[in-house]
C-alpha cells in the first residue's frame, strides 16, 4: 500500500537536524520500497515550512527547498498524486470528521489516500483515531 507522506514526515526526512529525522529515516528505509507519494498540498507545505524562519531554526529559500524536494521525489518508489478530490465530496459522516479548523487539511489528505488506495503516514498523534480504518499510520 502506497504511503502518502504528511508534511511533518517530509520535513523530518528533509532536515537532518529535525527532532524526528531518525524515526522518519528508519521508516523510509524500511517501507519506501512499498511506494510513497506526495501531493500538491504536501509538496507546498514542505516548501512553505522549510523556508519559514519562524518555524525552522535553520531555514532556506523557497528555491532551495524546491530543489531539496525534487531530490527527495526522485528517489525510488515515489509517486505524485494529483489533488483531484473535491473538499465537498463524501458522506455526512465524512464531513463530520472535520471536527475543527485544524482537521480540514488532515481529512482532505486522508480522503486523497483513500482515493488512491493508500494510507497517510504522519507524526500527528491526533490522527490516531483514523488509524482503525487503515487509512492513517502514526509514527
UniProtKB/Swiss-Prot annotation:
Cofactor(s), names only, from the UniProt record: Mg(2+)
Occurrences of domain PINc (ranges): 4-133
Function, as annotated: Toxic component of a type II toxin-antitoxin (TA) system. An RNase. Upon expression in M.smegmatis inhibits colony formation. Its toxic effect is neutralized by coexpression with cognate antitoxin VapB39.
Compartments reported by the entry: Secreted
GO biological process: negative regulation of growth
Keyword Secreted: yes
Pfam families tied to this protein: PIN (PF01850)
Stored CDD domains: PIN_MtVapC25_VapC33-like (cd18678)
InterPro entries reported for this sequence: Mtu_PIN, PIN-like_dom_sf, PIN_dom, VapC_family
Main location: secreted
Family note: Belongs to the PINc/VapC protein family.
Record: residues binding Mg(2+): 6, 106
Gene: vapC39
Presence of keyword Nuclease: yes
Protein name (Swiss-Prot/TrEMBL): Ribonuclease VapC39
Entry EC number(s): 3.1.-.-
GO terms, molecular function: magnesium ion binding; RNA nuclease activity
Keywords: Hydrolase, Magnesium, Metal-binding, Nuclease, Secreted, Toxin-antitoxin system
